[in-house]
Amino acid sequence: MLAKLDRLLSQANIPLTDQQKQQLVDFVKLLDKWNKAYNLTSVRNPDEMLVKHIMDSLVVSQHLQGQQFIDVGTGPGLPGIPLAIANPDKQFVLLDSLGKRITFIKNAIRELKLTNVTPVLSRVEEYQEQQFDGVLSRAFASLNDMVDWCYHLPNTSGHFYALKGQYQPEELAEVSKPIELVDVIKLNVPELVGERHLVVLNR
């Protein structure tokens, strides 16, 4: 699995240390192991997880601005844990409302010895602890839902980072709260079938 990850990282031009690569492989192994009992992801094959979960998360890394991030609806820690491994200098809060996901994330943090991840069991609208440089999510079906539920989370210069498949410009027109489009970035995820985009917004 390490050899495949090496190849994917090379294709995506993402430089990581040997320790970071090993942490990512160990995370996939943990996810695969826990998935059998907890049903954390519909992706069952570890090699597929490397592409659909690890690489799909890591390609966002170079576009992040700031130090404090929250991953809303993180599920089993995606994209938060891969991004935290790749960015040990940044802090990540991983938020989810389902206990089994947060239990898995706590275990992964312990096993991988991550010091820059804080798991939080909460609904997003009830989380008022702090504001962030970036609000990340792969979980929302529409931009309007993401902005609506997470509007209180970015700080004054913070951004929303929405990981999407295809980007439909009309989605932006459906956002009910005041928002500004900063960028739409086409992401290159090696071996992934289908388009991926990062939509960057600010208030």
UniProtKB/Swiss-Prot annotation:
What superkingdom does the record give? Bacteria
Coarsely, its chief localization is: cytoplasm
UniProt xrefs under InterPro entries: rRNA_ssu_MeTfrase_G (IPR003682), SAM-dependent_MTases_sf (IPR029063)
Where in this chain does the entry annotate a coiled-coil region? Answer: none
Q: Which Gene Ontology terms of cellular component type are present?
A: cytosol
Q: Which Pfam families does the protein's record reference?
A: GidB
Q: Which UniProt keywords apply?
A: Cytoplasm, Methyltransferase, rRNA processing, S-adenosyl-L-methionine, Transferase
Q: What class of enzyme is it?
A: transferase
Q: Which reaction does it catalyse?
A: guanosine(527) in 16S rRNA + S-adenosyl-L-methionine = N(7)-methylguanosine(527) in 16S rRNA + S-adenosyl-L-homocysteine
Q: Name one molecular function that GO assigns to this entry.
A: rRNA (guanine-N7-)-methyltransferase activity
Enzyme Commission code(s) on record = 2.1.1.170
- Output the PANTHER family linked to this UniProt entry: S-ADENOSYL-L-METHIONINE-DEPENDENT METHYLTRANSFERASES SUPERFAMILY PROTEIN (PTHR31760:SF0)
Q: Which NCBIfam families match?
A: rsmG_gidB
Family statement drawn from the similarity comment of this UniProt entry: Belongs to the methyltransferase superfamily. RNA methyltransferase RsmG family.
Q: Tell me, what does this protein do in biology?
A: Specifically methylates the N7 position of guanine in position 527 of 16S rRNA.
Protein's recorded name = Ribosomal RNA small subunit methyltransferase G
